[in-house]
């Protein structure tokens, strides 16, 4: 099923969509309206299906979008929201990366790909690949992983990464 809800944050609309069965299978969002959200939903659906996670597009009301929003605004700690994630279709390595990132890199801070890789005894490229395939943005805070030389990329838009970090009060990485 999918649950979609619109919220407001820092004077902007944010649309949050969550695929779920018993737990969250995937999250996507848009700061650019409902039409762009539909593009993001299709991208997430394709990612989940490539990972053999069955996706049902039937809309059903759920508390999950509000939970994601509460993580976004800091009312729920990221690590406390891990229990809502199914981790279906996620590799054991990706799950480890997501859990370490979520538990170790707190709201208001960032970590470089290299630093996170060192914590996990792996390569920065492997960490980057896991971040790119993260089906749980906002809850698993891949936006907090930055390049040594600057902000770095973010799917769907670099501007979204900057906005998420600004919401969290991160200074110096958002300009």
Swiss-Prot record:
It comes from the Archaea. The active site is at 142 (nucleophile). It catalyses: a 6-O-methyl-2'-deoxyguanosine in DNA + L-cysteinyl-[protein] = S-methyl-L-cysteinyl-[protein] + a 2'-deoxyguanosine in DNA; a 4-O-methyl-thymidine in DNA + L-cysteinyl-[protein] = a thymidine in DNA + S-methyl-L-cysteinyl-[protein]. InterPro entries: DNA_protcyst_Mta_Thcoc, MethylDNA_cys_MeTrfase_AS, MethylDNA_cys_MeTrfase_DNA-bd, MethylDNA_cys_MeTrfase_DNAb, MGMT, MGMT_N, MGMT_N_sf, WH-like_DNA-bd_sf. It holds the Pfam family MGMT_N. One of its GO terms (molecular function) is methylated-DNA-[protein]-cysteine S-methyltransferase activity. One of its GO terms (cellular component) is cytoplasm. One of its GO terms (biological process) is DNA alkylation repair. Keywords: Cytoplasm, DNA damage, DNA repair, Methyltransferase, Transferase. The keyword Translocase does not apply. CDD domains: ATase. SUPFAM superfamilies: Methylated DNA-protein cysteine methyltransferase domain, Methylated DNA-protein cysteine methyltransferase, C-terminal domain. It is found in: Cytoplasm. The keyword DNA repair applies. Its EC number is 2.1.1.63. Involved in the cellular defense against the biological effects of O6-methylguanine (O6-MeG) and O4-methylthymine (O4-MeT) in DNA. Repairs the methylated nucleobase in DNA by stoichiometrically transferring the methyl group to a cysteine residue in the enzyme. This is a suicide reaction: the enzyme is irreversibly inactivated. This enzyme catalyzes only one turnover and therefore is not strictly catalytic. According to one definition, an enzyme is a biocatalyst that acts repeatedly and over many reaction cycles. Belongs to the MGMT family. This is Methylated-DNA--protein-cysteine methyltransferase. It comes from Thermococcus barophilus (strain DSM 11836 / MP).
């Amino acid at each position: 099923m999918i649950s979609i809800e619109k919220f407001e944050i820092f004077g902007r609309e944010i649309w949050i969509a969550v695929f779920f069965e018993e737990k969250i299978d995937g999250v996507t969002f848009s700061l650019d309206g409902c039409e762009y959200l539909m593009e993001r939903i299709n991208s997430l659906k394709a990612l989940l299906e490539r990972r053999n996670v069955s996706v049902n597009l039937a809309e059903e009301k759920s508390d999950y979008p509000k939970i994601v929003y509460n993580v976004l605004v800091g009312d729920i700690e990221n690590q406390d929201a891990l229990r809502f994630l199914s981790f279906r279709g996620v590799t054991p390595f990706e799950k480890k990366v997501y859990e370490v990132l979520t538990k170790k890199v707190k709201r208001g801070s960032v970590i470089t790909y290299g630093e996170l890789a060192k914590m996990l005894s792996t390569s920065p490229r492997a960490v980057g690949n896991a971040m790119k395939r993260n089906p749980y943005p906002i809850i698993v805070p891949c936006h907090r992983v930055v390049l040594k030389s600057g902000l770095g990329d973010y799917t769907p838009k670099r501007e979204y990464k900057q906005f998420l970090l600004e919401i969290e009060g991160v200074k110096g990485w958002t300009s």
